[in-house]
Amino acid sequence: MNYKLFSPYTIKDVTLKNRIVMSPMCMYSSENGDGQVTNFHLIHYGTRAAGQVGLVMIEATAVLPEGRISNKDLGIWDDSLIEGLHKTTTFIHDNGAKAAIQLAHAGRKAELETDALAPSAIPFNETMKMPIEMSKHQIKDTVLAFQQAAVRSKQAGFDVIEIHGAHGYLINEFLSPLTNKRTDEYGGSPENRYRFLREIIDSINEVWNGPLFVRISANDYHPDGLTVQDYVQYTKWMKEQGVDLIDCSSGAVVPARIDVYPGYQVQYAKHIKEHANIATGAVGLITTGAQAEQILNNNEADLIFIGRELLRNPYFPRIAANELGFELEEPYQYERAPGKISTNK
């Protein structure tokens, strides 16, 4: 029997062998504070590739040193960082998967000794530092940093780029009226609040012609914040600019209580897919092969992003295949251990 979860998916000239994506998750393991890849990253991402993930997306990688969440984040702000990232893509490719990178700037959530930057001088909460409102010059410099990061991503061998526009980081801060109180062309109307992301996408398109994803927080979980319906217009604009897929997460732009349950964010992937007519990825408490297969069969999303479940078990695709009764092609090195893998957690 054929299963959609294990069917190929082609975006532009990149074909994924299945619909399983390793969701980007910060590892805080660049131990020297220099943004460099370490042996941990090679093992961490290479193992998921060997585990038969279709697309391995590495963690939020800072386009500027001041755009890190912590000083242990990976970086792509300098050419000296390309070599380590290229080793990572080589590990991933050699083990049968495609490689993606998430380009990010932490904005007001940067927990560094340097000043945090944001569209407006509003802290995330009472315990975090007051950010500095970005000047137009700083905005232009950041747009350029995303473009340069895209150039380096190509040099490092990545197949896919994702722009991190979610979880209360810099781009999300510009998009949301809760965090963007600017009175210039970067604030006010939805069109103005989208301008920063528009300029980033345009700048990346000048140097990158591969698949381009954007991760969004499709719900601010606040009465005065953005909802998934607001993101329909945003994602229509993204599609017009050539974005290929929307990775649909939610929350974290402001402190909020979120009702979390299995597949709680799938509704956002479905809504964006239906109303913006663009491919989507579903993410959030997707933990079984049957659940993932159902999402795809219901046409609620095109790709399945797996996060914590891949931390618990790097071989999740094999477990999902066993669960569904699908015979997954094994790496030849593991052919002496056919059959079921324990699903005990």
From Swiss-Prot:
This is NADPH dehydrogenase. InterPro entries: Aldolase_TIM, NADPH_DH_bac, OxRdtase_FMN_N, YqjM-like. HAMAP family: NamA. NCBIfam families: PRK13523.1. Its EC number is 1.6.99.1. FMN binds at S23, P24, M25, C26, A60, Q102, R215, G307, R308. One of its GO terms (molecular function) is NADP binding. Substrate binds at Y28, H164, G165, A166, H167. It comes from the Bacteria. Pfam families: Oxidored_FMN. The gene is namA. Belongs to the NADH:flavin oxidoreductase/NADH oxidase family. NamA subfamily. GO terms for biological process: response to toxic substance. Its cofactor is FMN. Keywords: Detoxification, Flavoprotein, FMN, NADP, Oxidoreductase. The keyword Protease does not apply. It comes from Bacillus cereus (strain ATCC 10987 / NRS 248). Catalyzes the reduction of the double bond of an array of alpha,beta-unsaturated aldehydes and ketones. It also reduces the nitro group of nitroester and nitroaromatic compounds. It could have a role in detoxification processes. It catalyses: A + NADPH + H(+) = AH2 + NADP(+). Homotetramer. It is an enzyme of class 1 (oxidoreductase). The keyword Coiled coil does not apply.
